[in-house]
Amino acid sequence: MARYTGPSWKVSRRLGISLSGTGKELERRPYAPGQHGPTQRKKISEYGLQQAEKQKLRHMYGLTERQFKNTFNKAGKLQGKHGENFMILLEQRLDNIVYRLGLARTRRAARQLVNHGHITVDGKRVDIPSYQVSVGQVISVREKSAKNSAIAESLEVSSFVPEYVTFDAETLTGSLNRLPERSELAAEINEAFIVEFYSR
């Protein structure tokens, strides 16, 4: 399945989550596109709930179905809770860390920065959004990209940086200083539904 590249607000309204990070797409019409109002939602089956939860998380991180399932399978080989390990692996993606550092306003924009070669890991350019960042690795903006307008605009509006990452706005350098706790990740996601979905 290809990655969705259409308007994010449509997906946000359909799934009931904000992909922009602002929540504005849900303020005026907090129901799926095509519906005439919030009372038009049909009763969802257990399978439907599980599938919807999977889609929420997949679109939140902007992954294809194959990428999503591969990461899920990788998480299953780790010690600990499958669902929590899955969430943490998603959070360790390079494009997500770039987003968490405030270098991009959305994960989609962060993925473009990585794809276009604006980001380095431990001093080496990495253009693979799915690259798994390890604790202690240094993420930086390339010197040639330091004046990138998209990065500058994002830094102007970004204020919250999670405790598990550190960022120096002067040097445009950050790092993953520890793995995140589940309580620090998306509270609106019930990863148990996703584990159940793939266990069917």
From Swiss-Prot:
Q: Where is this region: Disordered?
A: 22-43
The UniProt entry's sequence similarity note says: Belongs to the universal ribosomal protein uS4 family.
Question: What role is this protein assigned?
Answer: One of the primary rRNA binding proteins, it binds directly to 16S rRNA where it nucleates assembly of the body of the 30S subunit.
Q: Which InterPro entries match?
A: Ribosomal_uS4, Ribosomal_uS4_bac-type, Ribosomal_uS4_CS, Ribosomal_uS4_N, S4_RNA-bd, S4_RNA-bd_sf
An example GO biological process term is: ribosomal small subunit biogenesis
What PANTHER family has UniProt attached to this entry? 30S 40S RIBOSOMAL PROTEIN (PTHR11831), SMALL RIBOSOMAL SUBUNIT PROTEIN US4M (PTHR11831:SF4)
Q: What is this protein called?
A: Small ribosomal subunit protein uS4
User: Secretion signal: which residues?
Assistant: none
Q: Which UniProt keywords apply?
A: Ribonucleoprotein, Ribosomal protein, RNA-binding, rRNA-binding
What does the subunit comment say? Part of the 30S ribosomal subunit. Contacts protein S5. The interaction surface between S4 and S5 is involved in control of translational fidelity.
Q: Name one Pfam family in it.
A: S4
- One Gene Ontology cellular component: small ribosomal subunit
Its lineage reads:
Bacteria, Bacillati, Bacillota, Bacilli, Bacillales
**Do the record's keywords include rRNA-binding?**
yes
Gene this protein is translated from = rpsD
- Please give the Gene Ontology molecular function terms for this protein: rRNA binding; structural constituent of ribosome
